[in-house]
């Protein structure tokens, strides 16, 4: 009795301990189940993120992406991932935790739906990219076709331009030939007038009377004919070439006496360049003289003969009316490079009864030289100054380009422009010879001079 009681007393704590152990084991089971469920969810989220990242990241590898499916054979597997090497990764959940399972099924469905939507978006994006590439390819093909057509058009334009250039060259040559024929015809008329005048003088002396008015009219015809070298004994030099042929062959200032201006005037003679005998009518060398002058100054001349000067349009006209003259233009830039332009036919107001009223038109052709032809296009043009607009432009070219010249619309040369000393920012308003230095370089030195045509020309 006593021992049974002791046993009962001793066994009571053992029963209480057993109940407590069962309670503790049940609590641990729930905790373990919760931990496993959390790990499974975290693992599923991680795997899903990795899969999404792999879908967005286009790796250079050609391996197919892993396939994610539900495992119908094993209901305890939440997700099965099949890799490229045919191995599988199963994500399990504890079957003893039935309560969260519906939520996991919903999560699984949402993830699979998101993956399906992502695949669909990729297909749509791929279709758009293909459409864009197709459109770009069509545009490139159209551009290539357009470039080919433009190139063909350019080749046609080039052929037409070359043909026009040849025609223009032929027309220039024909113009020079006609000018020479007209000059020779005028010379013959002048010689005929001189002969008739001599006959009239003889008749007047014999008859004691005459017709002075007719004689005066005939003498008005310009006497522009060929002449012998030098001047006859006792006669006055008509230009620097006569002086040169008389034996005076030093550069300097001399007096000349043109046929139609017997009182004469002084000129500077270049006796050294290309055989000598040149009569200088323009020089630019240091910018000491203002060449932006008016009509009267350019008609009568200005400056200093030994330095910068303009001889005068009227005097140039009187000189070039005597015979067939050639023009030489010497040029120098600020790097001391030199060039020249030679025109075998030159004159001012050759066919004018009143050259000033006609604007002192220039006649020029037959270019040779090293500077390029920047004056031939001005042939036939009248002289324009800032106060006398004779050009073809809507504006006064002399005022616009700060010079005075035989402007057309407006110029390819401007030797009476501003002395700007080399390269300048303004356009074409310096001492320009465009075929040699362009329109934005003002030359250091220019000299324009004339001489009778040589026999070999």
UniProtKB/Swiss-Prot annotation:
Fibrinogen C-terminal domain boundaries: 231-454
Bilayer disposition of the protein: Single-pass type II membrane protein
Chain positions carrying an annotated carbohydrate: 233, 336
SS bond list: 240-269, 397-410
Transmembrane segments: 34-54
Residues involved in Ca(2+) binding: 389, 391
Spans within the Cytoplasmic topological domain: 1-33
GO annotation, cellular component aspect: membrane
Key words of the record: Calcium, Chitin-binding, Disulfide bond, Glycoprotein, Membrane, Metal-binding, Signal-anchor, Transmembrane, Transmembrane helix
GO molecular function: chitin binding; metal ion binding
Major subcellular location class: membrane
Residue numbers on the Extracellular membrane side: 55-457
Region annotation (Disordered) ranges: 1-20, 211-235
Gene3D superfamilies: Gamma Fibrinogen, chain A, domain 1
Annotated localization: Membrane
One Pfam family, short name: Fibrinogen_C
Annotated positions for site Implicated in ligand binding: 401, 411, 427-428
Quaternary structure annotation from Swiss-Prot or TrEMBL: Homotetramer; disulfide-linked.
PANTHER family: FIBRINOGEN C DOMAIN-CONTAINING PROTEIN 1, FIBRINOGEN/TENASCIN/ANGIOPOEITIN
Role: Acetyl group-binding receptor which shows a calcium-dependent binding to acetylated structures such as chitin, some N-acetylated carbohydrates, and amino acids.
NCBIfam families with a match to the protein in the record: GGGWT_bact
Protein name: Fibrinogen C domain-containing protein 1
Gene behind the chain: fibcd1
């Amino acid at each position: 009795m006593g021992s049974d009681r002791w046993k009962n007393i001793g066994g009571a704590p053992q029963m209480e301990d057993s109940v407590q152990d069962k309670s503790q084991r049940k609590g641990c089971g729930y905790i373990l189940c919760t931990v496993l469920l959390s790990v499974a969810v975290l693992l599923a989220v991680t795997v899903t993120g990795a899969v999404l990242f792999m879908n967005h990241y286009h790796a250079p590898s050609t391996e197919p992406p892993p396939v994610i499916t539900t495992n119908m054979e094993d209901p305890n597997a939440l997700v099965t991932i099949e890799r490229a090497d045919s191995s599988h990764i199963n994500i399990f959940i504890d079957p003893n935790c039935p309560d969260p399972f519906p939520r996991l099924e919903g999560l699984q469905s949402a993830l699979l739906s998101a993956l399906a939507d992502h695949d669909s978006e990729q297909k749509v994006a791929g279709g758009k990219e293909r459409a864009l590439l197709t459109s770009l390819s069509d545009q490139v093909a159209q551009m290539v076709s357009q470039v080919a057509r433009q190139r063909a058009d350019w080749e046609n334009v080039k052929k037409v331009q070359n043909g026009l250039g040849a025609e223009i060259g032929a027309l220039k040559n024909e113009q020079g030939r006609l000018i020479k024929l007209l000059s020779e015809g005028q010379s013959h008329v002048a010689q005929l007038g001189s002969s008739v005048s001599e006959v009239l003088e003889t008749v007047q002396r014999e008859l004691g009377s005459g017709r002075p008015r007719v004689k005066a009219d005939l003498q008005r015809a310009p006497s522009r004919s060929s002449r012998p070298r030098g001047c006859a004994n006792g006669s006055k030099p008509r230009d620097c070439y006569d002086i040169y042929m008389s034996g005076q062959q030093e550069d300097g200032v001399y007096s000349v006496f043109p046929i139609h201006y017997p009182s004469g005037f002084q000129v500077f003679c270049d006796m050294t360049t290309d055989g000598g005998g040149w009569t200088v009518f323009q020089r630019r060398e240091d910018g000491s003289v203002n060449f932006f002058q008016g009509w009267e100054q350019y008609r009568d001349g200005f400056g200093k003969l030994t330095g910068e000067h303009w001889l005068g349009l009227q005097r140039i006209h009187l000189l070039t009316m005597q015979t067939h003259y050639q023009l030489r233009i010497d040029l120098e830039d600020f790097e001391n490079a030199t060039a020249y332009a030679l025109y075998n036919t030159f004159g001012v107001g050759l066919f004018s009864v009143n050259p000033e009223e006609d604007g002192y038109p220039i006649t020029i052709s037959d270019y040779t030289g090293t500077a390029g032809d920047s004056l031939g296009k001005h042939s036939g043009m009248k002289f324009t100054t800032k106060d006398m607009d004779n050009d073809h432009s809507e504006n006064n070219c002399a005022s616009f380009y700060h010079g005075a010249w035989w402007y057309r619309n407006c110029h390819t040369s401007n030797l009476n422009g501003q002395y700007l000393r080399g390269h300048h920012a303004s356009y074409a308003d310096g001492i320009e010879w465009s075929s040699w230095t362009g329109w934005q370089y003002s030359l250091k030195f220019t000299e324009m001079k004339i001489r009778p045509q040589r026999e070999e020309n």
